[in-house]
């Protein structure tokens, strides 16, 4: 294993003193014990471990903005209302020290800006992002609430928090390969091997992800995605063409894919 930097060594010592690893995983520290993990619970249905176990802290200094990271350590930025375990408030001093150590340990110096400044012909567009979020796109709203509006399926994390919490380069890399950052996640990859699974809406993976980021940054002044504006009682009705709905079904499995046809014949 490569030798730890002074920031990493100090941070890991600090985490041990505060016992952060009693609830959070952060390599190379000892992860939470199984008997402790058994006490974590969730009020959300069908969210699995992601809904009950506090998130890992691997790379968190690259994931969260400085302000969001400090607020999180202070317990002042709860974004997982379904998680029954709550983050304590460690106060300003501990929060400042840990925030600095996380950022110095994790943040990369050669990050690409997103959207990419000076390359306006390749950056995202709000309208593409809105389309990708909806049921005729990638269907993000099937699992994620948006600005307080309920999702069509399970109630995972509200994406309204994304632009204020996350660093854009981390967001881009996470969407490309969610399982790399969170092994066992139910979040699918819509850009396998860097290639878009859906044509249009900017065309390239780079443009599509930038478009989603642009939409989330302008969420307060944008229309809701198709399927959420007038979702009614969450009934999805295929009309012109079959509709694909990724969800978690009791009899079909955790990564079920339901396909609805306009003649009331459906498969999963």
Task: Enumerate the predicted regions with their spans.
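A generic secondary-structure signal for well-formed alpha-helical elements
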Residues: 18-22, 27-31, 77, 106-110, ...
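Electrostatic cytochrome c docking/interface patches
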Residues: 1-16, 30, 108-135, 224-228
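Repeat-solenoid scaffold signature
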Residues: 2-21, 26, 152-161, 211, ...
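Beta-strand-rich N-terminal accessory domains
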Residues: 229-268
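Axial heme c-ligation environment in periplasmic c-type cytochrome domains
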Residues: 1-3, 33-62, 74-105, 112-119, ...
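Long, helix-rich interaction regions
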Residues: 93, 120, 124, 135, ...
């Amino acid at each position: 294993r490569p030798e730890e930097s002074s920031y990493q060594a100090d941070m890991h010592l600090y985490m041990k003193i505060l016992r952060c690893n009693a609830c959070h995983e952060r390599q190379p520290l000892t992860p939470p014990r199984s008997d402790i993990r058994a006490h974590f619970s969730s009020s959300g249905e069908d969210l699995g471990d992601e809904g009950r176990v506090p998130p890992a802290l691997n790379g968190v200094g690259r994931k969260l903005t400085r302000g969001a990271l400090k607020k999180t350590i202070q317990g002042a930025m709860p974004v997982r209302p379904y998680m029954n375990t709550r983050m304590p408030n460690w106060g300003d001093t501990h929060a400042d020290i840990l925030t600095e150590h996380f950022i110095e340990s994790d943040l990369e110096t050669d990050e690409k800006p997103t959207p990419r400044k000076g390359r306006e012909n390749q950056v995202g567009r709000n309208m593409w992002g809105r389309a990708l979020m909806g049921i005729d796109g990638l269907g993000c709203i099937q699992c994620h609430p948006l600005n307080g509006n309920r999702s069509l399926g399970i109630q995972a994390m509200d994406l309204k928090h994304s632009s204020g919490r996350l660093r854009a380069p981390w967001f881009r890399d996470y969407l490309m390969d969610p399982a790399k950052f969170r092994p066992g996640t139910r979040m699918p990859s819509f850009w396998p091997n860097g290639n878009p699974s859906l044509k249009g809406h900017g065309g390239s993976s780079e443009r599509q992800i930038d478009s989603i980021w642009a939409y989330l940054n302008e969420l307060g002044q944008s229309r809701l995605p198709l399927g959420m504006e007038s979702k009614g009682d969450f009934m999805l009705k295929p009309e012109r063409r079959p509709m694909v709905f990724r969800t978690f079904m009791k009899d079909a499995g955790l990564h079920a894919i339901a396909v609805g046809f306009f003649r009331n014949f459906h498969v999963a």
